[in-house]
Regions:
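Glycine-rich (often Gly-Gly/Gly-Pro-rich) flexible segments and glycine-rich loop motifs
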Residues: 120-164
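Short, surface-exposed beta-strand/loop "edge" segments at domain boundaries and coil↔beta transitions
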Residues: 1-2, 8-20, 65-73, 97-100, ...
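Extended, loop-rich substrate-binding clefts of extracytoplasmic carbohydrate-active enzymes
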Residues: 30-84, 91-96, 100
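Acidic-aromatic substrate-binding/catalytic surfaces of carbohydrate-active enzymes
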Residues: 1-49
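Short, ordered beta-strand-loop transition motifs
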Residues: 49-57, 80-81, 126-128, 186-187, ...
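Acidic (Asp/Glu-rich), glycine- and aromatic
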Residues: 82-138, 244
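Generic recognition of long tandem-repeat/solenoid scaffolds
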Residues: 1-5, 10, 55-64, 182, ...
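Beta-strand-rich recognition/accessory modules
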Residues: 152-256
Length: 256
C-alpha cells in the first residue's frame, strides 16, 4: 500500500493534467546497516489518516507501535491555492539504538511522474568544488544509472559494504545544489517544483535523488536522539511551465 497522494491534477478549462501515479510517497526508512527494515517499511503497516476539523489539512500518522523502527511520524498536507501543497513533516524516535552504530536515519519520498518532458532534474548549484552558482541540469553520470545529489557542504553517507539499499545511499560527488529547491519538466508543458526550508543543518539535511521517471527526495537525520523531535517544511507546486527564473522566484516568495 502506498502512502501520500494518489494523484495531483491541474485543471485548465476542460483539460486535466495529471502529475503522477503516486506522489509524496514515503517509501523507505533506512539505517546505515544492512537490515530488512530498510526496504519499503512505510508500505507494510497502517497509518491513521485524519482531516483537520476546521481547515484544509490532512494528517498521515504512523504510530511508533506500528513502526518496526519504533519511530512515530506525521506528515501534514495543506492545499495552498492556486497550485501548491504545503508539507510539514515531524518525527520522534523511541529507540534510536535500532539504527545502529552509524546513528543516522534516512526517510525517502518518491513521486512517480506520469510522463516527463525532460528526465533530468534542475536546480541551482555548483558543478565542481570551486565552482560558482549556476543552473544545473542533473542526470545520471559516472556510469551510474541513478543516484543522489547533495547540498554544497554535505558529506556522503557511510554505510556497510553489504547494505541492502546501496542504490539509495550512494551519492554523486558533484554537482551539488546550493538552494533547497528543484524542478522537473513534465509533458504537456507542465512543471513540478519541490522546495524545502533547509539545505543542511548540524543535525539534518535534504537530498535530491534521480530515479527517473520518479522525482525523489530524502530527509537525513544525524546523531538521532531519544524523544527529540525532528522535521522539515516543504512545498510542492504543479503548474504550467514558464521559465526557470520563475521557478526560482516561487521558492524565494515561499521562503520569505
Amino acid at each position: 500500500v502506498l502512502s501520500g497522494l494518489q494523484s495531483l491534477s491541474y485543471l485548465d478549462a476542460d483539460e486535466r493534467f495529471e502529475a503522477f501515479r503516486a506522489g509524496l510517497n514515503l517509501e523507505h526508512v533506512y539505517s546505515g546497516h544492512r537490515d530488512d527494515r530498510n526496504r519499503f517499511v512505510p508500505r507494510r503497516h497502517p497509518y491513521l489518516v485524519c482531516r483537520e476539523r476546521e481547515g484544509r489539512s490532512v494528517f498521515m500518522v504512523r504510530l511508533a507501535s506500528q513502526s518496526p523502527w519504533s519511530v512515530e511520524h506525521v506528515m501534514r498536507l495543506t492545499p495552498s491555492p492556486p497550485d501548491s501543497i504545503d508539507i510539514d513533516f515531524r518525527c520522534r524516535f523511541l529507540d534510536p539504538s535500532r539504527f545502529g552504530a552509524r546513528e543516522y536515519v534516512g526517510f525517502f519520498w518518491a513521486n512517480y511522474m506520469r510522463e516527463l518532458h525532460d528526465a533530468a532534474i534542475h536546480f541551482r548549484g555548483v558543478s565542481d568544488e570551486d565552482g560558482t552558482e549556476e543552473w544545473i541540469r542533473a542526470e545520471s553520470r559516472d556510469g551510474w544509472d541513478v543516484g543522489t545529489y547533495l547540498a554544497a557542504d554535505a558529506s556522503a553517507l557511510e554505510f556497510d559494504t553489504d547494505h541492502n539499499m546501496i542504490l539509495n545511499l550512494r551519492s554523486f560527488s558533484t554537482p551539488r545544489f546550493t538552494r533547497p529547491f528543484l524542478f522537473s519538466r513534465s509533458a504537456n508543458n507542465m512543471v513540478l517544483i519541490l522546495m524545502f526550508d533547509r539545505l543542511q543543518t548540524g543535525i539534518d539535511e535534504i537530498r535530491f535523488s534521480h530515479f527517473p521517471p520518479a522525482v525523489d527526495f530524502q530527509y537525513v537525520i544525524h546523531g538521532v536522539e531519544t524523544e527529540r523531535r525532528y522535521g522539515f517544511r516543504a512545498r510542492m507546486i504543479w503548474r504550467p511551465w514558464t521559465t526557470r527564473e520563475e521557478c526560482l522566484q516561487a521558492w524565494r516568495s515561499w521562503q520569505s
